[in-house]
């Protein structure tokens, strides 16, 4: 039965019953309606089959019987595979054996039937049935054989494979068993061993066992899977066999049905079993005797055949069975059958039991396998844990060993430490005793030295004071004489100048006639070219008289048509080169050729003088100048002609030079058309045409010729003075030009020369242009470097015809609408032909040597703007001429950029630019330069310029043969670093005595902050090679040298500044000499007056030009007569002023008022005006004639001149005023008066050298500040101040528009000014662009206010002005720093005034930013970030004398910008406080706003030491912009110098009205970081500070008296609306720490009525807590009122009785106050009663301190020698700068310990630091860490300081990054 398939393994799902076999597919349908998946089944008759097998196994001894006798269930351990071969063998063996015996049996039955005569019928029937069965069996056997032959080999092969796999699995199982055994043995050993502590080894073992178990399981699973796959494959084959068998069955006999076949099969099986039984019985009865009737043959044969070993297994039984019925009887047969059946049943039972046992064993085997796996896993885990525990045990042993070793070491170290401690204690005790002795000795020695020095100082101060009184008397008398002389001189000068005007007008007319004749001749020459070319050239350049050909560089625009050749600097052989050198191309293009009207005639008529003027600076370094009278005449001539400028033929847009402050990429911006805008690079110069449009954009042009829109907030105007001051010396003589020339250069009706200076200024970046004699010295970028207004040039120059020696040219005229005066045709730079106006654009050039080589032909257009660039329209002709560019060279090379230029072979072609093979943007036609940016330092590059032919093919003859069209150039960028050195280093007197201002022009940095490829970090200042200071700001422009550094500078000769970077410092800048005038000027008791007499060379340019306000030759950039109100659109006309060098080089000498006035023009204005020009920004079309202004000024002057020159200068500076006694004259204030009458309190001028860096917002603060001071001076019965003359631009009376303050001019952003003024409360803005950090902006603004010029009285606080001395000096008059150092006497005199009721009681004038005085036009809205308000009160030491009644202008309840306490609202002498206010403009308070580049002054106090040293109590607190997280800082205040208990206390905070509290309060941080003290609310909010409830600004008092520095904060401004309803609140006891008089000390307007006065030590009763403004409601002396919280301290009383006793006592002695807490029945609590003071911060920016403090008594002289007096002080706390100092330069500070005696030199500086010495080392010492007698020890006004007061004083410094 080959069709049988293997059964599933026992226990598997789907396992079949042990007896069930697969059914036949063809006969029996499978369960579920689908064909059965098994072979034909004989499950219905399993017993018969089993009996047959059993019988056969019993009867046969062959091994195959064993296999067949097994149950079909497949309980064989080998699996079901073993069953198949057994069954197959059984079928194969039984099949053939059954056929022959059955045939024989049939025959035997037939024979028996015959013999027995049919006696046994049942047997016959059986035999018959048996025969049928045999036949059927034979048929089935044949079919089985056929099936076996077809499928058995394949099945047998698979079975063999499965057996092999079984064997392999068995081997694997044996291996696993062996491994498990080994693991168990190992596990037993591990378990028996002592278990260490669990450790990492156990985990490792577990992991290893887990990995091994996973591998084993994966192997077993893969094996089982493979076996299952094989079983599945066999099952599929069986199904296929079933299908085949089905087909075969269908082809079998049709009569055999399935059921019949099954039934017959069962019957046959039963019959076979029965026959087998019979055979078995026959075999058992073999030994029985046979009947005689039986033939012996068959029986013998049966018996013989039965045991035959080789016979088939069933042959003998079959024969016996055939004979059995004959031998046995029927009963026996039945008995035998029963016996066989019973045996069969037994066998069946036994088989079933065996099957059950097999199943049990199989299950047992599976369980054992599972246990084996579990045991293996457990073993692996145990092994892993064992290894981990072993590792832990090892580690434990190691740790225990190390612990033991460490214990031993610890014991030894402990013993050593104990011994060292004992030694240290002993040494410490000895050291302390020695320190006490040393301390005592030092104190004695220092005290002796101090007394000696004080004695010497007193003698010196007395001598100086006597000398000063004498000088003042002399100066007053001399000023009177000079005033009278000046008036006479001015009158005579006016007459002479008017005569000169008439003469010049006549000359002008004659020149006009001559010019017309020359023009006719020129037209004739033009019609006859050729041999007449040279004559034409001579006529053009010489006969016309306007422009004699200069032999050298001429960068002045030529005012004639023939001036073109001189305008461009070209190499020989290049087109357009007409002169050997020309520094810059045609500055005439700035404003066009001079007017062809009276202007031209005028310049022509004055030919002799004009020729000398037109000579280049190199050709005439010392131009002849007529006498002073002639100078005045020329000035008058220019004055009379200048107003006609706007109406003339100057059609070009006004041009201005701007500097890009930041980089700008239009495509990253928000605008819709970025292509219309220009990309900017920081530090790049831009030429601006016209005014700003409504969107805040200018129309500008870059130096490379690109034009477009320029955002106004990214650029900053370059003042004309900056341009001229940056020129080489030989170029500075450009101001020698006559009036017509300068009007030609000027950009506005006022004659500002920004245009000309722009061209000049651009010459400096290209110094190589003048040195390139054989190379191309290009004119700058088109319309950018040399031609700012872009002179239109011809286009498309072509050769119409070329002959042997001549060419015919044609071109297109300039497409722009411009007045053409003709064309110049040049060959190799030589003028060959000139065409007049109206001539056709064609020319014939003859006598050309075309075969000698290429000739460069260029065509220039002569327009009303000047001559065009010859390289814009040029062509190469002749032999070897091509389109390849020539003379390719590097024009400008830096570390990160390079500019190349070339001479185009044909200007009609565009040129492709390649850098290192990479294509760059091409150069358009008529462009001959390219700039490469963002290069790498020190990197070689190869630049290639290739002429691009037109795409449509050659359009010139011969171009198809061109081979070379490119020129190549190799260059290497400069190595990175060091950075460039700063420029224009200058030293000036500082804002207060003892301070110098060192200023410089910062290096230009790009957007990344780098210069020359390295990042700029700051600047270092060196004095004679020794570094004295560093400024950590890359944009710093000045620094104040403090007292300690000043001592070094007094012996130095020069100062240099270096730029710092991570790659080192730059080279030294040009040294700035320390003139003898500076050192005395910086001392408080000395007055030095540089001689005001300029040399004739210095005065010559002054008289020879009529510059505009921006011209450096203008003495005052903003002057306007006191009564002159200029129309809003008119730029302020400024008369000439001296060149910068005029007075700088003058030696110091005593001088008269007139001389001093001239010196003011030469020095003060020279710096202040040159760096902060005001009028040049006003784009008004016209200005009142200078002649008219001159008349007005002359009428307003009363100063006679001592000489014609001085008179001329006085006339040129009519805005200045003379101070003579108490006369309110409006003349020039002489320098002598400034310096000699020091007590007049004139504000010092702080020239701002780095003005170019600053933004254009400061003119607001300066204008308003000046205006404010003017009105104060007016109301104080003072003389007309310089402020009021400056107020020609700034006074806003009668509603007239005031012009920007010239000294505060912020270049050309006047529009910004006015727009800012439109904003409410934004009157005071800094000059900084506010995209830089606010701290830096504030610092820069400080410096700017120190240096930006005299126009801002609040910015340049001078010494206190004694209004009652009869000297008519106005404190508003600006002064140069140091020109008028304050003498102590004068300062005291001014100080005393503030205590006078008439002066103190007055209400301050109020003027608001919302006043209609400011024109609300032409101002771009400022960036909110750009408004940094400087809350500087004008109460600086120099402003102290500004007293007297003040009024509110126009009665308008206007709001002033943020101010400090005294300016905000009241009489308090508060130090200027700097605040960054949101949306607010800066208020300039003090020129002492320190150098922005240095550190910002955050000193929240001053000390009495400083006060007495003459460095008044002005302190500046800066806080950041409100949004930056910093609160609005509080201004600290200096302590006044007065008798003890008089004015020695700090002033209270200014409190704000309630309406100001709408903005959330920003509690500023004092330097100590204590937030519990309220800030100055006047400076915290974004609203106006210091205004009372009605919106008016509180009275502003300029008193010298400032708050005590230790207060650290201002008195908060009180809200008047608050009531006194505090009686119900709990009562607290406070003690007054300082004297307080609200009337004189409080900034609040109603202080005398609502605030409570008290004395130091007075007991005060306080109700409740302080209000939001920092005021308590209290009671004292029988009065109730407000008490400032920062001037009192609470007293902690133990009992109510003690409190009552204290109230009755009403006073505490100073000793108790000094003792602090714990020494009495009560203690008073203040901030920081114990512990060291806060970390001191130093600010390197020196604040301007008042030279003296007010004192009710006679002033006390503080000589300069006192600054150096040594003193002894004791350290109260330990101080280590490395740990405790917040400052960056900790190496400059001294470390010390508590108890150290430190020798202090001089007074405390503005940062709160002394310069001291300890143990031979010198450095800075924080004053709040010291105690004991200071420099002012012994002074009556010294206020005892408590530790609490000390702890409140801190220093704060912010370094700009």
Curated annotation (Swiss-Prot):
Which PROSITE patterns does the UniProt entry name for this protein?
Answer: FN3, SH3
List the SMART domains hit by this protein, alphabetically. Answer: FN3, SH3
Q: Which domain of life is it from?
A: Eukaryota
Q: Per the record, what is one GO cellular component?
A: cytoplasm
Subcellular location(s) per record: Cytoplasm; Mitochondrion
Q: Which residues form the Fibronectin type-III domain?
A: 791-882, 884-976, 981-1081
- Which UniProt keywords are listed? Cytoplasm, Disease variant, Dystonia, Intellectual disability, Mitochondrion, Repeat, SH3 domain
Q: Where is the composition biased (Polar residues)?
A: 87-96, 1201-1218, 1278-1292
What role does this protein play?
A: Required for synaptic transmission regulation. It probably controls the recruitement of voltage-gated calcium channels to the presynaptic membrane, and modulates neurotransmitter release.
Q: What is this protein called?
A: Peripheral-type benzodiazepine receptor-associated protein 1
């Amino acid at each position: 039965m080959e069709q049988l398939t293997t059964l599933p393994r026992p226990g598997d799902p789907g396992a079949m019953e042990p007896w069930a076999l697969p059914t036949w597919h063809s006969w029996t349908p499978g369960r579920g309606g689908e064909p059965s998946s098994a072979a034909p089944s004989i499950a219905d008759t399993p017993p018969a089959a089993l009996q047959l097998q059993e019988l056969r196994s019993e009867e046969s001894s062959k091994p195959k019987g064993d296999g067949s006798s097994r149950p079909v269930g497949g309980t064989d351990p080998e699996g079901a595979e073993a069953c198949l071969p057994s069954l197959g063998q059984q079928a194969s063996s039984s099949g053939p054996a059954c056929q022959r015996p059955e045939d024989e049996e049939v025959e035997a039955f037939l024979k028996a039937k015959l013999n027995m005569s049919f006696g046994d019928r049942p047997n016959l029937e059986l035999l018959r049935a048996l025969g049928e069965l045999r036949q059927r069996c034979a048929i089935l056997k044949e079919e089985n054989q056929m099936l076996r032959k077809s499928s058995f080999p394949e099945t047998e092969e698979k079975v063999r494979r499965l057996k092999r796999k079984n064997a392999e699995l068995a081997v694997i199982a044996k291996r696993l068993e062996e491994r498990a055994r080994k693991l168990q043995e190992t596990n037993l050993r591990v378990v028996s061993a002592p278990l260490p502590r669990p450790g990492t080894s156990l985990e490792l073992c577990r992991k290893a066992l887990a990995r091994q178990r996973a591998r084993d399981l994966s192997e077993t699973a893969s094996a089982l899977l493979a076996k299952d796959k094989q079983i599945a494959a066999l099952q599929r084959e069986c199904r296929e066999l079933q299908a085949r068998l089905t087909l075969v069955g269908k082809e079998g006999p049709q009569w055999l049905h399935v059921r019949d076949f099954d039934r017959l099969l069962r019957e046959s099986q039963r019959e076979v079993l029965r026959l087998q039984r019979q055979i078995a019985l026959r075999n058992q009865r073999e030994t029985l005797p046979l009947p005689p009737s039986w033939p012996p043959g068959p029986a013998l044969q049966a018996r013989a055949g039965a045991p035959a070993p080789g016979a088939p297994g069933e042959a003998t039984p079959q024969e016996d069975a055939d004979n059995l019925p004959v031998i046995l009887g029927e009963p026996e047969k039945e008995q035998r059958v029963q016996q066989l059946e019973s045996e069969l049943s037994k066998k069946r039972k036994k088989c079933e039991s065996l099957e059950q046992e097999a199943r049990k064993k199989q299950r047992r085997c599976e369980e054992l396998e599972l246990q084996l796996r579990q045991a293996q896993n457990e073993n692996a885990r145990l092994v892993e844990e064992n290894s981990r525990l072993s590792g832990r045990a090892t580690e434990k042993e190691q740790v225990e060993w190390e612990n033991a070793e460490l214990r031993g070491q610890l014991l030894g170290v402990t013993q050593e430490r104990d011994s060292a401690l004992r030694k240290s204690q002993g040494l410490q005790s000895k050291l302390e005793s020695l320190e006490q002795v040393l301390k005592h000795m030092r104190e004695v020695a220092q005290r002796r030295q101090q007394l000696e020095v004080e004695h010497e100082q007193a003698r010196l101060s007395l001598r100086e004071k006597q000398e000063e009184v004498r000088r003042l008397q002399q100066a007053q008398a001399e000023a009177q004489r000079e005033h009278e002389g000046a008036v006479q001189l001015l009158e005579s000068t006016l007459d002479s100048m008017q005569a000169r005007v008439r003469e010049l007008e006549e000359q002008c007319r004659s020149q006009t006639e001559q010019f017309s004749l020359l023009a006719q001749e020129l037209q004739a020459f033009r019609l006859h070219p050729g041999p007449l070319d040279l004559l034409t050239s001579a006529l053009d350049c010489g006969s016309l008289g306007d422009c004699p050909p200069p032999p050298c560089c001429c960068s002045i625009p030529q005012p004639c048509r023939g001036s073109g050749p001189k305008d461009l600097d070209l190499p020989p052989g290049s087109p357009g080169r007409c002169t050997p050198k020309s520094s810059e191309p045609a500055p005439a293009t700035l404003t066009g050729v001079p007017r062809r009207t009276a202007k031209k005639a005028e310049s022509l008529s004055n030919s002799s003088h004009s020729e000398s003027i037109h000579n280049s600076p190199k050709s005439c370094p010392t131009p002849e100048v007529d006498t002073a009278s002639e100078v005045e005449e020329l000035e008058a001539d220019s004055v009379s002609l200048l107003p006609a400028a706007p109406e003339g033929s100057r059609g070009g847009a006004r041009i201005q030079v701007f500097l890009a402050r930041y980089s700008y990429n239009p495509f990253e911006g928000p605008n819709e058309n970025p292509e219309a805008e220009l990309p900017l690079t920081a530090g790049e110069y831009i030429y601006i045409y016209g005014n700003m449009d409504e969107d805040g954009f200018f129309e500008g042009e870059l130096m490379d010729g690109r034009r477009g829109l320029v955002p106004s907030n990214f650029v900053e105007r370059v003042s004309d003075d900056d341009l001229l001051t940056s020129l080489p010396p030989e170029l500075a003589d450009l101001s020698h030009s006559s009036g017509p020339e300068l009007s030609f250069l000027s950009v506005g009706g006022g004659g500002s020369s920004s245009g000309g200076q722009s061209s000049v200024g651009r010459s400096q970046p290209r110094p190589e242009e003048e040195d390139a004699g054989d190379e191309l010295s290009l004119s700058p970028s088109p319309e950018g470097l040399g031609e700012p207004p872009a002179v239109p040039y011809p286009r498309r120059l072509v050769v119409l015809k070329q002959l042997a020696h001549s060419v015919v040219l044609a071109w297109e005229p300039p497409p722009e609408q411009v007045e053409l005066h003709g064309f110049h045709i040049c060959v190799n730079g030589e003028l060959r032909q000139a065409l007049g106006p109206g001539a056709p654009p064609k020319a014939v050039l003859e006598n050309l040597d075309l075969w000698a080589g290429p000739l460069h032909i260029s065509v220039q257009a002569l327009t009303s703007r000047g001559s065009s660039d010859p390289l814009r329209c040029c062509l190469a002709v002749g032999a070897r001429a091509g389109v390849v560019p020539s003379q390719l060279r590097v024009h400008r090379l830096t570390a990160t950029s390079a500019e190349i230029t070339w001479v185009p072979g044909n200007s009609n072609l565009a040129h492709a630019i390649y850098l290192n093979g990479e294509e760059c943007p091409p150069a358009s036609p008529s462009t001959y330069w390219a700039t490469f940016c963002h290069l790498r330092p020190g990197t070689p590059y190869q630049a290639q310029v290739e002429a691009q032919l037109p795409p449509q093919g050659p359009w010139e003859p011969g171009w198809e043969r061109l081979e070379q069209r490119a020129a190549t150039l190799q260059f290497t960028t400069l190595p990175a670093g060091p950075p460039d050195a700063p420029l224009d280093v200058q030293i000036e007197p500082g804002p207060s005595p003892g301070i110098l201002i060192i200023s410089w022009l910062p290096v230009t940095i790009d957007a990344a902050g780098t210069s020359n490829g390295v990042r700029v970090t700051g600047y270092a200042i060196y004095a004679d090679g020794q570094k004295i200071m560093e400024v950590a700001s890359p944009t710093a422009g000045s620094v104040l040298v403090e007292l300690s550094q000043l001592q070094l500078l007094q012996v130095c000769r020069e100062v240099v500044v270096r730029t710092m970077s991570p790659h080192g410092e730059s080279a030294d800048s040009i040294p700035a000499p320390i003139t003898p005038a500076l050192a005395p000027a910086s001392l408080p008791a000395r007055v030095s007056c540089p001689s005001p007499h300029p040399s004739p060379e210095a005065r010559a340019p002054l008289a020879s030009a009529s510059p505009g306000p921006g011209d450096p030759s203008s003495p005052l950039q903003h002057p306007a007569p006191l009564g002159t109100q200029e129309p809003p659109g008119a730029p302020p006309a400024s008369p000439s002023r001296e060149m910068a060098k005029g007075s700088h080089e003058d030696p110091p000498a005593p001088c008269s008022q007139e001389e001093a006035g001239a010196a003011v023009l030469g020095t003060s204005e020279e710096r202040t005006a040159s760096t902060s020009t005001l009028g040049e920004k006003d784009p008004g079309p016209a200005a009142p004639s200078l002649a008219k202004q001159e008349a007005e000024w002359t009428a307003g002057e009363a100063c006679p001149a001592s000489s014609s020159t001085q008179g001329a200068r006085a006339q040129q500076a009519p805005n200045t005023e003379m101070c003579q006694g108490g006369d309110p004259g409006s003349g020039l204030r002489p320098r002598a008066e400034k310096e000699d009458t020091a007590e007049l309190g004139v504000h010092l001028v702080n020239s701002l050298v780095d003005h170019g860096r600053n933004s254009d917002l400061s003119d607001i603060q300066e204008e308003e500040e000046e205006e404010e001071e003017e009105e104060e001076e007016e109301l104080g019965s003072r003389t007309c101040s310089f402020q009021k003359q400056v107020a020609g631009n700034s006074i806003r009376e009668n509603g007239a528009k005031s012009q920007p303050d010239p000294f505060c001019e912020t270049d050309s952003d006047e529009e910004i000014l006015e727009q800012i003024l439109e904003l409410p409360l934004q009157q005071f803005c800094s000059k900084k662009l506010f995209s830089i950090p606010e701290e830096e902006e504030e610092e820069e603004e400080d410096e700017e206010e120190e240096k930006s010029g005299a126009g801002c009285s609040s910015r340049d606080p001078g010494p206190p002005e004694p209004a009652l001395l009869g000297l008519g000096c106005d404190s508003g008059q600006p002064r140069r720093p140091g020109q008028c150092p304050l003498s102590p006497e004068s300062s005291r005199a001014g100080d005393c005034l503030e205590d006078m009721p008439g002066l103190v009681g007055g209400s301050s004038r109020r003027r608001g930013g919302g006043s209609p005085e400011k024109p609300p036009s032409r101002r771009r809205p400022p960036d909110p970030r750009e408004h940094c308000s400087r809350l500087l009160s004008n109460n600086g030491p120099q402003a102290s004398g500004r007293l007297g009644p003040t009024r509110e202008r126009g009665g308008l309840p206007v709001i002033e910008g943020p101010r400090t306490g005294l300016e905000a609202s009241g009489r308090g002498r508060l130090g200027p406080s700097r605040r960054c206010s949101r949306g607010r403009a800066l208020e300039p308070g003090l020129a002492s706003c320190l150098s922005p580049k240095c550190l910002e002054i955050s000193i929240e106090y001053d000390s009495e030491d400083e006060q007495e040293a003459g460095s008044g109590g002005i302190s500046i607190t800066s806080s950041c912009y409100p949004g930056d997280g910093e609160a609005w800082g509080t201004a600290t205040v200096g302590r006044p110098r007065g008798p003890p208990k008089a004015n020695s206390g700090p002033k209270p905070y200014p409190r704000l009205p309630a309406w100001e509290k709408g903005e959330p309060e920003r509690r500023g941080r004092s330097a100590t970081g204590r937030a519990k003290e309220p800030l100055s609310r006047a400076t915290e909010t974004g609203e106006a500070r210091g205004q009372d409830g009605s919106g008016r600004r509180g009275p502003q008092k300029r008193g010298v008296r400032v708050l005590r520095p230790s207060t650290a904060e201002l008195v908060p401004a009180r809200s008047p609306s608050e009531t006194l309803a505090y009686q119900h609140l709990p009562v607290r006891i406070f003690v007054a720490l300082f004297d307080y008089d609200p009337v004189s000390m409080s900034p609040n307007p109603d202080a005398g009525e609502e605030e409570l006065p008290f004395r130091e030590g007075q007991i005060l009763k306080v109700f409740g807590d302080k209000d939001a403004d920092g005021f308590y409601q209290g009671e004292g002396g029988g009065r109730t009122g407000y008490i400032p919280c920062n001037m009192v301290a609470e007293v902690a009383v133990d009992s109510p009785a003690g409190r009552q006793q204290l109230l009755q006592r009403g006073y505490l002695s100073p000793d108790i106050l000094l003792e602090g807490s714990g020494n009495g029945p009560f203690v008073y609590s203040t901030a920081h009663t114990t512990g060291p003071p806060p970390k001191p911060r130093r600010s390197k920016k020196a604040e301007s301190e008042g030279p003296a403090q007010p004192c009710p008594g006679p002033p006390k002289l503080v000589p300069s020698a006192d600054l150096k007096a040594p003193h002894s002080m004791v350290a109260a706390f330990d101080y280590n700068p490395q740990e405790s100092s917040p400052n960056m330069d900790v190496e400059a500070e001294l470390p010390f310990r508590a108890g150290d005696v430190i020798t202090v030199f001089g007074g405390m500086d503005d940062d709160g630091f002394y310069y001291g010495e300890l143990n031979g080392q010198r450095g800075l010492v924080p004053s709040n860490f010291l105690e004991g007698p200071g420099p002012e020890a012994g002074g009556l006004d010294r206020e005892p300081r408590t530790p609490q007061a000390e702890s409140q004083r801190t220093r704060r410094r912010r370094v700009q990054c």
